[in-house]
Amino acid sequence: MSAASPASIIQELASAAKQYENNESGAREALIAQSRALIASLEVPSEFIQHTFWSQPALSAIVRLATDVNLFQYLKDAQEEGLNAEALASKTGMDVSLFARLARHLVAMNVITSRNGVFYGTALSNGLAAENYQQSIRFCHDVSRPSFGAFPSFFKGNGYKTPALGTTDGPFQSAHKVDISFPQWLVGNPPYLQYFNSYMSAYRAGKPNWCDNGFYPVADRLLNGFDASVSDVLLVDVGGGRGHDIATFGSQFSPLPGRLVLQDREQVINSIPADESRQFEATTHDIFTTQPVKHARAYYMHSVPHGFGDEDAVKIMANLVPALAKGYSRVLLNEIVVDEERPVMSATNMDLIMLAHMGAKERTEADWRSILTRAGLKVVNIYSYPGVAESLIEAELA
């Protein structure tokens, strides 16, 4: 099937614009996607090459440099008054000529604006001034970008084969000249471990949660039909880290008809600050052992099988099976489900991040169905939200 014509894409843009004005969910994401599609339909190969190999790499490098000299913070602090090249060059420690050349590219790429020799921050650049985004930029430029750059030489050298899961011989190792796994490297490079954690936090920032209105129908699928005589536990967050997701769930649906239980490794649970106001219980659990909480209404996992190979993913899911009450308990997986027909960039981005750094992958719907079937479960439904890479897979006993 041929690509959409510019005229048809413009019609889609107009429709998405009306939805955006009405504050409809997914409209912003649709506008971005259609805008990119319009550019792709209009660009000629020479423009594509310049954009891909000149404009974007230069932008990445300048944005990374900006984190070292606090450029976005200075522009944010200047607010509507802005700052001229001389003032910004002085603040950032650059010579005026160099600053002006770099800043002009930021203007050309719509990151900042300029008028009558004065530079101004934008909503985008002001957002990038936040520390979590500054650290995310450092991780993406210093760690991920070289790993992607190693793709051509690495895959040519290995005969174009997928690296083994958890590899110590992949694009990341090739780019950074190391022979240890990506997680081991992070532990040995504490600043980048912090940058990586900030990146993961920023990756999810501002995106709808699985339990938000319009995503997964919590009231219909969990709250309605809850039976305390079967179990007084409403939700178990398996491998839930320090409790971000389960705390969000509790705050959105308080008062709750049943208990909330967070499970993770001992060192993670012990790192959670004491808080008498929290609505969940925190307990230790190894996901490779049988689930100890029986007959809860739902068992929730957010990106838990995600980092494991298929065999381990099957074991993790199978360990839930003895705890489930047939026809009552639900298994909820908050995971990326890669659409094979119409993949979205947020999903393919993360899939390639996994390939570059760990030899892992994001799974398709067929992949998830296969894993759950092998574990003794069946998919009831897959819920998605417009513009969000992660879906909510609901499963139950087969």
UniProtKB/Swiss-Prot annotation:
The domain of life is Eukaryota
UniProt cross-references to Pfam families, sorted A to Z: Methyltransf_2
Which keywords fit this entry according to its UniProt record? Cytoplasm, Methyltransferase, S-adenosyl-L-methionine, Transferase
Effect on the protein of changing Q267W:
Loses a majority of its activity against the three substrates DMMPA, FDHMP-3C and FDHMP
**Reactions catalysed:** (4E,8E)-10-(4,6-dihydroxy-7-methyl-3-oxo-1,3-dihydro-2-benzofuran-5-yl)-4,8-dimethyldeca-4,8-dienoate + S-adenosyl-L-methionine = (4E,8E)-10-(4-hydroxy-6-methoxy-7-methyl-3-oxo-1,3-dihydro-2-benzofuran-5-yl)-4,8-dimethyldeca-4,8-dienoate + S-adenosyl-L-homocysteine + H(+); 4-farnesyl-3,5-dihydroxy-6-methylphthalide + S-adenosyl-L-methionine = 4-farnesyl-3,5-dihydroxy-6-methoxylphthalide + S-adenosyl-L-homocysteine + H(+); 6-O-desmethylmycophenolate + S-adenosyl-L-methionine = mycophenolate + S-adenosyl-L-homocysteine + H(+)
One Gene Ontology biological process: methylation
Q: Where in the cell is it found?
A: Cytoplasm, Cytosol
InterPro entries, alphabetized: COMT-like, O_MeTrfase_dom, SAM-dependent_MTases_sf, WH-like_DNA-bd_sf, WH_DNA-bd_sf
Gene3D superfamilies attached to this UniProt entry? Vaccinia Virus protein VP39 (3.40.50.150), Winged helix-like DNA-binding domain superfamily/Winged helix DNA-binding domain (1.10.10.10)
Q: Which is one Gene Ontology cellular component term of this protein?
A: cytosol
Q: Which residues bind 4-farnesyl-3,5-dihydroxy-6-methylphthalide?
A: S144, Y199, S303
Q: Record-annotated residues binding 6-O-desmethylmycophenolate?
A: S144, Y199, R265, S303
A GO molecular-function annotation: O-methyltransferase activity
Mainly resides where? Answer: cytoplasm
Which SUPFAM superfamilies has this protein been placed in?
Answer: S-adenosyl-L-methionine-dependent methyltransferases, Winged helix' DNA-binding domain
Q: Which positions in this protein are listed as binding S-adenosyl-L-homocysteine?
A: N197, Y203, D237, G239, H244, D245, D264, R265, D286, I287, H302
Q: How does it assemble?
A: Homodimer.
Protein task: O-methyltransferase; part of the gene cluster that mediates the biosynthesis of mycophenolic acid (MPA), the first isolated antibiotic natural product in the world obtained from a culture of Penicillium brevicompactum in 1893. MpaG' catalyzes the 5-O-methylation of three precursors in MPA biosynthesis including demethylmycophenolic acid (DMMPA), 4-farnesyl-3,5-dihydroxy-6-methylphthalide (FDHMP), and an intermediate containing three fewer carbon atoms compared to FDHMP (FDHMP-3C) with different catalytic efficiencies.
Provide the family line: Belongs to the class I-like SAM-binding methyltransferase superfamily. Cation-independent O-methyltransferase family.
Protein name, entry field: O-methyltransferase mpaG'
Organism of derivation: Penicillium brevicompactum
The gene is mpaG'
